[in-house]
Amino acid sequence: ALPILSKGDIHRGGRSVAKVELDNGTILYYKPHSLDKNIKYQELYNYLCRKTGISCRTVQYLSHDSYGWEEKIENIPCKNESEVEHYYFRMGIHLFLGYALGATDLHGENIIAHGEYPVIIDMETYPGYLKQQSEKDGSSVEEKINKSTEIKLANSVIHTGMLPVLTWGRGNRGVLISAMGTEEKIKTPFKLPVVKDDKTSDIHIEYEPVEMQIKECIVRLNDQVINAADYTECIIRGFCRAYMVTMADKKVEVMLSGFFDGRSRVVLRHTQQYAMYLMASFHPDYMKSRECRKALLNVIHKEGESSFMKEIHDYEIDSLLEMDIPCFEIDANSRSVYDGNGGEHKEYLPCTPYESWRMHMKQMSYSDMECQCDYIRLSMEMLKASDGKKKMFPTRIKGYDTDKERKIYSQIRKIVHRI
C-alpha cells in the first residue's frame, strides 16, 4: 500500500504537493514542479558552508521538467550547545542567500530545524524581484526619502520573511511571525469560520479567532525550546561570513546568476486572503450556481481599476471558481507577469528581475552589510520584548555617514515603531 496525503495549496487545475509513504516506511514528497532550483541552491549553500568552515546536510532530490521528488526532513532537537550555535550560524548563511536573491517567503512553514541543520524546503519564490528607485518616485525631498525608505526595507533582510515581524495588526494587537521558531501559539486577531458540533444534528458555523502553531522550525536543545534572540550574534556571524565570501569570491556571484534562467513564483496577494475568498464562496447561499459564486467573488474587482489589473482580477476569480489558489510567475528576463493559466500580462515590472538583481549586487558593500546587521538586531529584539518590560528596539544604531542616510534611518525607525 502507498498512503498518499495531499499537502499545501492547490494550483493550476488541482495540482498540489503530496506526501507519499512507501511500503518500507520511507516518506517522500511529490512536488508538481521542477526541483532544479532546489538543487542549485543546495550547491550554492554547500559552497558557502565550505568557505565559512562549517558542514552542511545534503537533501536528496529527484528533479524532472514538471515535477520532482524530495526526501522528508524530520524536525529533531540539537544535542548540545555547540549544535545550537551552529544552527543559527547556518541560518545566517540562509538569511544572506535570501537577501542576495530577493526571497520573500522564508517563513516558518518553509524551514525545518533538523538538529544543527536548518533545511529550506520551498524554493518557488527564488529569485524574487528587488525593487529599484526611479527618478519618477516622488516630487518633493520628503516623498523621495519616503520612497527610498520603502525600497530600502523591501530589499532588506527584513523582507525575506525569516526574521520576526509584526503582522495582522499593530503594536500589542499584532502577531509576531518568523522562521526563528517559538513554542507559542499564534492567534489570529481576526475571526474565521469554524465548524462546531461536527457529526451531529446541531452542526453549525461560528466565527472566532483561530490558533495555529508552526512546529517544524522550532529549535530544541534536548527537550528545551531555544529562544533565537539569545543567538542573534551567531546569526549575524553566519550572515557576515557569507556576505564577505561573496564580495571576495566571484564564483559565488556566478552561482547566484544561475538562478536567473527561468521563472519564479511571485506573490501578488496573500494565500490567506485567497483562502478566505474561497471559503466564503462555499457558503450554501452562493453554492446554488456558478453565477452566484462568481457574483460574490467579483468583490475582488476594484472601482476604477486599470485594464491591466482587471485582467489580473479576472484570472483570480476564474481560478477560485475552479477551486484553485491563484498563482503568478515572473521571468528573469522579462517585465511581464504570468498567471497560472499561462496568460502573459505585459509591462508589469519597471525592469526585468535580472536587471534589478544586477543593481542590487552592485550596492553590496561593508557599509550595507553593517546596515543589514542593524536590521537583524532590531528585528530579533522583538523576541526579547514579549514580557512588555524591555524596549522593543535599541536607542542607538551606528554606521550611517551622511545626512541623507540619517534621515532615511529616522524614517525606518518611525515605520518599524508604527508596524
What role is predicted for each listed range?
Residues 1-103, 117, 372:
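Conserved ATP-binding subdomain of kinase catalytic cores across diverse folds
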Residues 1-43, 118-119, 164-419:
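Regulatory N- and C-terminal appendages and interdomain linkers associated
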Residues 72, 76-183, 192:
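Conserved kinase catalytic-core segment
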